[in-house]
Amino acid sequence: MKKTVLLLFGGASSEYAVSCVSAACVADNINKELYQVCLLGITADGKWYLYSGDTDSMRDLSWVNKEEYLTPAVISPSKTHQGVLLEDGTVIHVDAVFPVLHGKNGEDGTMQGLLALSGIPYVGCNTYSSAVCMDKVTTKILCEKVGIPVVPYAYFRKNGFDVQKAVEECEQKLSYPMFVKPANAGSSVGITKANNRDELVKGFEVAFDNDYKVLVETGISSAREIEVAMLGNKDAVASVCGEIAPGADFYDYETKYVSDTASYYVPARISDTLSDTIRACAEKIYRTLDCAGLSRVDFFLDENDVLYFNEINTIPGFTPISMYPGLMGKCGYSYSALIEKLIENACEEKL
């Protein structure tokens, strides 16, 4: 008998569009002989609909205008339902949820908390680790405690923020160029590069427009971005290393999803010894942050091959250009087999 799998997509997040494309790819590639797929879309302004239309409309974001395919619905927080609740009281039982949601309100523990209440097995990290991993500052603090190397940094909160004092602190602790980042935004949203004091001040403005907490890091000279995909629960495995050459000043949202100027190398152009070191570091980070299901762990590698942990993504992208499925593909997982493994892991973790 087929299991009913609910794919969540969209969301009130700056990464709404990426989520819609990722979910469309998952829906197209999931094994229909094993799973009955239901699509639950969340609009950018937070409305929830069961969606029965085509995936192309998800990709071009027009799904929200296809009223004939939209039925208001929510995930019931009641374990007696374990499914989707329609306005008329009808309950659609769900065996597993794949929250293909990126960024705030989807990847930060909020949705995971609802799913935990519902009693439905779901793909990915639990509420705690999702929340921790979303916060770049908290992640760095925890990883530093276990000896993971991180880029020199400082952080600030919007409440009581004094830009002059912040600039002075950054210039004392760090060096230009600096990168100014919202602590709780994904896909490089709101990140700016500051080569001087004026750009640092502007960077604070941009970052605080996206979050209440801001992280500032020293830029790493001639840095290469190395990524490792993690798959599994207690027996999690690390993929081969992948490398990103941005083709721009840095790997921002525009480079990732719009301009298509980045180059990707899988496996990365590094020695086997260095690859093993990075993969072991990714495994340590995954365990330290109590992750499960999947994550993508991102590093910087400087011109002397010194390694720095950058960040971790608990629901990485599943678009055609996303690194996570590409990295797992090099480990022998087709896109369809990867989805199946993720769902199996979700149900296993629930047992």
Task: Locate each region found by the language model.
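ATP-binding N-terminal substructure of ATP-dependent carboxylate-amine bond-forming enzymes
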Residues: 1-128, 132-134, 138, 157-166, ...
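Active-site nucleotide/adenylate-binding loops and adjacent lid/helix of ATP-dependent enzymes
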Residues: 2-9, 13-14, 20-24, 28, ...
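Hydrophobic beta-strand scaffold residues
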Residues: 37, 121-122, 150, 178, ...
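Glycine-rich phosphate/pyrophosphate-binding beta-alpha loops
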Residues: 102-103, 188, 244-247, 313-327
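Phosphate-binding site of ATP-dependent enzymes
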Residues: 195-280, 301-308
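Conserved metal-phosphate-binding beta-hairpin within the catalytic cores
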Residues: 218-220, 228-230, 286-318, 328
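Active-site "cap" helix and flanking loop/linker of ATP-utilizing ligase/carboxylase catalytic domains
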Residues: 243-295, 326-351
